[in-house]
Every structure is written in C-alpha cells, then in structure tokens.
Amino acid sequence: MTGGSGVVVLDNGGGLLKAGFGGDMNPTAVVPNCMAKPPGSKKWLVADQLQAQDVDVTGMTLRRPIDRGYLINQEVQREVWERVIRNLLQVDPNNSSLLLVEPQFNPPALQHATDELVFEELGFKSLCVADAPSLVHLYEASRQPSLFRAQCSLVVDCGFSFTHASPVLQNFTLNYAVRRMDLGGKALTNYLKELISYRSLNVMDETLLIDDAKEKLCFVSLDVPGDLRLARLSSNDNPFRCSYILPDGITYKKGFVKDLDEACRYSSLPANGESVRKDSSDSDRSKFEDKKKPELSQNEFVLTNERFLVPEMLFHPIDLGMNQAGLAECIVRAIQACHPHLQPVLFERIILTGGSTLFPRFTERLEKELRPLVPDDYQVKIIAQEDPILGAWRGGSLLAHRPDFESMCITKSEYEEMGSMRCRRRFFH
C-alpha cells in the first residue's frame, strides 16, 4: 500500500486511537485516547503528550471519552481529535475526508453526536463510517485471497472495552449473529489493580502503570491447575515470580520489569504444568543470586499467579463471579446463529484482533477450549493477526484508498440538508 490519499483514517478505540492516511500501511499516530492530569497540576495532558519520556504517569487523573465502547464525553473526544488531526497529522479537516471506525450497535443519539463533532466542530468535508469486523476481514482477505475465497470469516475482537465475536460475509457484518462479552483490556487492568492492592500495594489510582505491567507480564495459561501448584512454590523455584518497579519521579519516570529473564521463565515450562528440574549448580546459583537481591521496597510489587489469573477472565469469567459465557462459548454461539451452510466455513476462518489477543499463548489456549465444542467433522483454524492493534485501521486504509471511496461518503452539505439520521442510512447501520 502506498500513501498520498487525502482521506484521514481514524480508529477511535477506547484505549488507543489510531490515526493516519488512506493508502498507508501503518498509522501516523497511535496514542492514548484520553486526557490526564498529574497530581497537583492544573494542566491536562492530551493523547501523545502522555507518551513523552519525561512524563511521570504516577497517580494521574484520567478522563476518557469512551466508556464500555461508546462515546460518552464529546468535549474530551474533541480535545483528543483536535490534538491528533491538527498537531500530529497536520491536516486541514475542511479539505479532507474522514473514514471513522465506529463501534457496533452504536445508538442513534451517539451517531448524531459523532456527526456533529465531525462536521460542525471539526469541519470535515465528508464522512464514511465502518465497523471493525468488516475492516479486519477486508485486510486479511487482501493478504490471503486464496484462504478467503469464500468471502466470510468470524472476527473475534478482544478490545479495550469489550469482546465481540462477529461473523462477516462479503465485507458486511452479520449483526444478528454478533455475540458480545462485557470484558476487555480495561476490565483486566482493573482486576489486576484489585489483586495487587489486596496482596501488596494500593495501586487503585495507578491505571496507566498497571496497564503497562499487565501488557508486559501477563500471559495465558494452558494448564491453570498445574500452574497454580507451581505458583505456590518458594521464590527460587517459582517460575512465575517477578517484580515490577514503580517510578520514583527522580531516577526514572516510567515503570519497568525488574528482570526480563525472570519474567520469561514460564515460557520454558512444559504445557502439562510440570515443574522444570534444576540441577544442584542451578540451585546453588539461584540461592547466591537471591542473596544479592534487594529487599522488596515500597517502589515495587511482585506478581506470581496474578500473571495468568488476569487473562483467565476471558476464558472462564464465571469462575470470578461474572455471569457470562467464556470466549470459546461466545464464538460457538455466534457461529451457530448463522446459516448452517456458513458454520463449517466460519470455524475454519476465525480471525483474532484487538490488543488483548497479544497475551502469549492466547491462540493455543483458545483452540484448546474451542475444539471440544465444535463438531468432529469441522476443522478449526485460528488466524492471529501480525499486529492485532492495527488490524481495523489497516482495513480502513485499504477501503479509503479505493477509487469509489468518495461515493460511500456523506458530504457536509448532505448532512446539513438532510440531517444525521437520513444520511446514516447509506452505511447500512
């Protein structure tokens, strides 16, 4: 894909906002979709300003425009979009079209609020709206045309606010068959905050730090009972034990993993959860190194079984008191809601997208959970995207680069003449 398009492609995620130009392979900006204010400061930091190396994210007050997947704060969203469009992309909306990735089942009132923001406050000349599953399917079909000759797939989007299993046929999402779990990256971060606060330090106000710790340290277990047994071992023999250092505001302003090798020890374990034996020299060395380790300070916390119990929410939420089906059951229900002729094809084309699918071993665990629920004569094939955070944006970039793209858009003059509801009919929402 090559650049040069006058179309701004905006994937307005609840956690990260991805923005760039139609025809480009990668977005120009991938920034937090929020505003934050440091303790004792009156200045709000917006989007990319939170990513600066000299910014201490400890104890920040957050304001997010998106809650549970939907736009709830138009003022914050305008601030973020203004920052991204004018400062990072450096474009004039009056001379640009916008392709916006919008959440599924967006209520009409929120569609109208979005259109107001796009046309009246930012002044884009035209707008096209698409949902994430159809764009993810479009991108994967362009990469592997032979695999997607049937023109259908099941897109599993494990995002920041929710998880959707969405069948797609000929680039249209089959809304009647979509199944949703009210679990996403935000819920996992909140659960990790609760576990750490109960067992170690009070980190309930450290959303950005714990989000970073979750992304760097959590993984999906292939054998939860076996891993729980290993997690009870002493510190030297515990393959899951690792420390996360909190910023002190002076020496370092970002949190980090204390020992990356220690954090990756679990990856050498066999899948059946058996402990890896150590010879005497390894044991002696570990004892010697353990003596050299400093005592746990107020600026760090230790994780053990939390590392795999947090992602476990996605597979067995009922074990944690949530009255919801797990991810595998959600996928099966979505496929079973489709025509019987589509079902075997969908099981062979399950696409994983969204940041929560980046946990190590996610794909293997999902296949292990899914196989017993699928008829024996059906094949199960799971496609993990190379960069699941950018999947929807890249599909949008492809769509925006098509010659007929402008015919899919509603223009500002059409919006002013007919209003939001009549214009929206063009998008089949």
UniProtKB/Swiss-Prot annotation:
Swiss-Prot/TrEMBL GO biological process terms: cell division; chromatin remodeling; defense response; negative regulation of flower development; regulation of DNA-templated transcription; response to osmotic stress; response to temperature stimulus; seed germination
Subcellular location as annotated: Nucleus
Region Disordered: start-end pairs: 272-293
GO molecular function term, any single one: nucleosome binding
Keyword line: Chromatin regulator, Developmental protein, Nucleus, Plant defense
Role, per record: Component of the SWR1 complex which mediates the ATP-dependent exchange of histone H2A for the H2A variant H2A.F/Z leading to transcriptional regulation of selected genes by chromatin remodeling. Involved in several developmental processes. May be involved in the regulation of pathogenesis-related proteins (PRs).
Basic and acidic residues composition-biased segments: 275-293
Protein's name according to its UniProt entry: Actin-related protein 6
CDD domains the record matches: ASKHA_NBD_Arp6 (cd10210)
Taxonomic superkingdom: Eukaryota
Species assigned in the record: Oryza sativa subsp. japonica
Main location class: nucleus
Subunit structure: Component of the SWR1 chromatin-remodeling complex.
Membership in a protein family: Belongs to the actin family. ARP6 subfamily.
Annotated SMART domains: ACTIN (SM00268)
GO cellular component: Swr1 complex
